[in-house]
Amino acid sequence: MLLAIDSGNTNIVFAVYDGDTLRGEWRASTDSERTADELGVWLTQLLTIEGLNRLDISAAIIASVVPAMVFGLKTLCRRYFKCEPLVVGDEGVDLGLSILLDRPEEVGADRLVNAVAAHKYYKGPLIVIDFGTATTFDVVDADGNYCGGAISPGINLSLEALHMAAAKLPRVAIGRPRQVIGRATVPAMQSGIFWGYVGLIEGLVKRIKEEFGSDMLVLATGGLAPLFAEATKVINALDADLTLRGLLEIHRRNSTPVRG
């Protein structure tokens, strides 16, 4: 079985695949102070609850946008699963796509993994919107090349910034307001963020298509993707497991060392 690890700025997602079958998926908060042993004991217990044996995991792959997490996650794989993990972005790891950027080394691993999965399962040209700590818009052409994109602050990050920077604005949860014109502070904040982001999505998608010069499939992933897909017609498809499926595909493209 394969252990796929998606380490983001806010959460780490651990998933176990048996072939194409997703056997389990768990989340932990991203914390570079947490040791490999803490994560290992926690994950081993969750595997046991699902009826899985950690020793049946023979390979692992890691994508991380937090460099400080990589060492601990590699140690976790070696110590608890007796395997040397592939790390997206390491030299020699074949993604199966060309990165058509001036500085390809700067692209986040999660964005590249999403591009791999999007091209594999949906073809192109397409736009991938990932609603995470940042909201990213990534362009993949019909040949599977990664062409770049746009990065904006994530929804929850924007809400937190409002609360932290303005003394009288409270911390609020994201939600779809019943109306655009808020009649109190909280609904006004929710309206500004929610409908503002709908406008952001629609505006960027329109401009990307115009610049790219063709119609494109728009695919959304991330926890808030369903909420925004209901509010705009520009999103054509949702895929909650896009990043994990991208990790699975990259693992298949690369020879994985035999467990020691």
Swiss-Prot record:
Organism placement in taxonomy: Bacteria, Pseudomonadati, Pseudomonadota, Alphaproteobacteria, Rhodospirillales
A GO BP entry: coenzyme A biosynthetic process
UniProt main location, coarse: cytoplasm
Residues binding K(+): D130
Active-site residues per Swiss-Prot or TrEMBL entry: D110
Cofactor note: A monovalent cation. Ammonium or potassium.
List of residues binding ATP: D6, S7, G8, N9, T10, N11, I12, V13, T133
Record's catalysed reaction(s): (R)-pantothenate + ATP = (R)-4'-phosphopantothenate + ADP + H(+)
Complex formation: Homodimer.
Stated name of the protein: Type III pantothenate kinase
